[in-house]
């Protein structure tokens, strides 16, 4: 599961739908893998407005990556700063969580991640 995907996931427990604490899910005991993918600046420029930057900063820190800037970079920043472009590409596109858990900040439910796939099936008492 790519780090970019984590930015779009929230807790599936019914009681968490109305809580801001259910997003982002927090990676725990994460085993990461890296795929070498050719950098596509236009893809990053197009995806960046859809990313919740505060959540990405949280996830990035929890996974042990360097702290991202307070504000998301503009398309011009990405085009002029090759190091930033490469750093974001590596984090969003190349880094995958292969094993571990995703934990809800509201209810504490843990979603197991195995072979890069998170199990979002809930027991009947949580639906």
Curated annotation (Swiss-Prot):
Residues in TRM112 domain copies: 2-123
UniProt GO MF annotations: protein heterodimerization activity; protein methyltransferase activity; rRNA (guanine) methyltransferase activity; tRNA (guanine(10)-N2)-methyltransferase activity; tRNA methyltransferase activator activity
UniProt key word Nucleus: yes
Domain of life: Eukaryota
Chief place where the protein resides: cytoplasm
Cellular compartment(s): Cytoplasm; Nucleus
Alphabetical UniProt keywords: Cytoplasm, Nucleus
Gene Ontology biological process: maturation of LSU-rRNA; maturation of SSU-rRNA; positive regulation of rRNA processing; rRNA (guanine-N7)-methylation; tRNA methylation; tRNA wobble uridine modification
GO cellular component terms, semicolon-separated: cytoplasm; eRF1 methyltransferase complex; nucleus; tRNA (m2G10) methyltransferase complex
InterPro entries assigned to the protein according to its UniProt record, in alphabetical order: Trm112, Trm112-like
Function field: Acts as an activator of both rRNA/tRNA and protein methyltransferases. Together with methyltransferase mtq2, required for the methylation of eRF1 on 'Gln-182'. Together with methyltransferase trm11, required for the formation of 2-methylguanosine at position 10 (m2G10) in tRNA. Together with methyltransferase bud23, required for the formation of a 7-methylguanine in 18S rRNA. Involved in biogenesis of both 40S and 60S ribosomal subunits.
Subunit structure: Heterodimer of mtq2-rmt-1/trm112, forming the eRF1 methyltransferase. Rmt-1/trm112 is necessary for the solubility and activity of the catalytic subunit mtq2. Interacts with trm11; required for full tRNA methyltransferase activity. Interacts with bud23; required for full rRNA methyltransferase activity.
UniProt record similarity statement: Belongs to the TRM112 family.
Protein's UniProt name: Multifunctional methyltransferase subunit trm112
Organism: Neurospora crassa (strain ATCC 24698 / 74-OR23-1A / CBS 708.71 / DSM 1257 / FGSC 987)
């Amino acid at each position: 599961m790519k780090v970019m995907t984590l930015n779009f996931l929230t807790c599936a427990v019914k009681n968490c739908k109305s809580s801001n604490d259910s997003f982002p899910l927090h990676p725990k005991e994460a085993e990461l893998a890296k795929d070498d993918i050719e950098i596509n600046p236009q893809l990053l420029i197009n995806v960046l407005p859809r990313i919740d930057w505060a959540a990405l900063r949280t996830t990035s820190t929890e996974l042990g990556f360097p702290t991202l800037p307070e504000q998301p970079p503009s398309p011009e920043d990405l085009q002029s700063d090759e190091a930033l472009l490469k750093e974001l590409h590596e984090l969003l596109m190349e880094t995958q969580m292969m094993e571990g858990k995703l934990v809800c900040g509201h209810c504490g439910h843990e979603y197991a991640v195995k072979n890069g796939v998170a199990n979002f099936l809930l027991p009947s008492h949580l639906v």
